Regions:
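Active-site-adjacent substrate-binding region
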Residues: 213-315
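Catalytic-core environment of secreted peptidases
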Residues: 35-44, 68-72, 107-175, 189
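N-terminal capping segment at the start of a domain
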Residues: 14-62, 72, 78, 86, ...
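C-terminal motif of bacterial Sec signal peptides marking the signal peptidase cleavage site
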Residues: 4-7
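A non-catalytic alpha/beta surface segment that caps or lines the substrate-entry region
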Residues: 44-122
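Bacterial signal peptide processing site
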Residues: 9-11
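Acidic/histidine-rich catalytic neighborhood of metal-dependent amide-processing enzymes
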Residues: 139-237, 245, 249, 253
């Protein structure tokens, strides 16, 4: 299939045509405190070095993330993998899902090593379905990537902290991807490694990439084709914040989409509408209140997420 991807700035109001009962929802996450100081500390730690895939800086950041997740009570696994030659043809121009999920389409030699970070809750129940929260933690080779994507990684790490003891109708899966900046290699590896039973047991994915940058507009919600899916509908129904809907696919959300897993991507409205500049290396470019509010919105959705509602909208 050939994908037509639209930029972050082409957003529209989300309309689900559902009953107007949002105000009746109890937002249980209001009892959960998001720690802005931890958000700032995590961004600083993750972005302390350039983190292109396989680099010493990325390995150092992966160890920091691993240590934090372990401290929060998760069982953590590194998914080590080889990175192979990729290009636009094997990604956004892929003719089939299988071509996209072929990690070595050209049968080339490995051009590097990378590692995803997969965290499992201590109360994980294999008989329950799983909702994934994801972000990439690598950067390009010319930046420490405060915005892209220490911002998303720190958001995910804070969500992991407050959700560590979450125990309801489904599991929470936490994954930090490597090599997103090289044709989404990390998420392609993760999704392609899932068997059919594992994929069928996934409710969906919320991916976070480039959030909280000052002057880049509100946080918006993206789906690859710009149309509602079950995850965008649930997010809209279960938060106290209205998100504009836009076409996505420029981040790891594309890998889940190609794996036929419902996915949304959360980013600033104008996140991609710029060249890399000094803001990438400046912690002062981050609006931590915006990230805090995003964390609260995601928590609202998760803590009020009911399988009965999900299955109703899925029909």
């Amino acid at each position: 299939m050939i994908l037509l991807l639209t930029g972050c700035s082409e957003s529209k109001k989300l309309s689900t045509n559902q009953s107007e009962d949002n105000n009746q929802i109890k937002y249980k996450s209001k009892d959960i405190t998001i720690n802005e100081n931890l958000l700032k500390e995590n961004i600083k730690k993750i972005s302390s070095n350039v983190r292109n895939y396989g680099s010493d800086g990325e390995i150092e950041s992966s160890e920091y993330i691993n240590n934090q997740l372990t401290k929060y009570g998760y069982s953590v696994m590194f998914q080590e993998f080889d990175v192979y030659k990729q290009d636009q043809y094997t990604t956004v121009q892929s003719e089939t899902n299988l071509d996209y999920l072929n990690n070595n389409f050209y049968n080339s030699d490995s051009i590097g090593k990378a590692r995803n970070i997969i965290a499992t809750q201590r109360n994980f129940d294999k008989n329950k379905k799983t909702l994934y929260l994801t972000a990439h933690y690598d950067s390009t080779s010319d930046t420490i990537g405060i915005v892209d994507n220490a911002s998303g990684s720190a958001t995910l790490l804070e969500l992991a902290r407050v959700l560590s003891d979450y125990n309801d109708e489904f599991n929470i899966g936490i994954v930090f991807f490597s090599a997103e900046e090289y044709f989404r290699s990390g998420s392609r590896k993760f999704v392609s490694s899932l068997d059919e039973d594992e994929k069928n047991n996934i409710l969906g994915c919320i991916n976070i990439d480039m959030v909280g940058e000052k002057g880049k507009g509100p946080i918006i919600m993206q789906t690859v084709n710009g149309e509602n899916n079950i995850m965008s509908i649930m997010m809209d129904k279960l938060t106290n914040k209205e998100f504009n809907l836009s076409g996505g696919g420029s981040s790891d959300d594309l890998s889940f989409y190609m794996g036929e897993i419902p996915v949304i991507n959360l980013c600033n409205d104008y996140a991609k509408a710029r060249l890399y500049d000094d803001a990438e290396d400046n912690i002062e470019s981050i609006d931590f209140n915006q990230i805090k509010e995003l964390c609260e919105s995601i928590l609202n959705a998760i803590t009020d997420f009911k399988l009965s509602m999900y299955n109703k909208f899925l029909k």
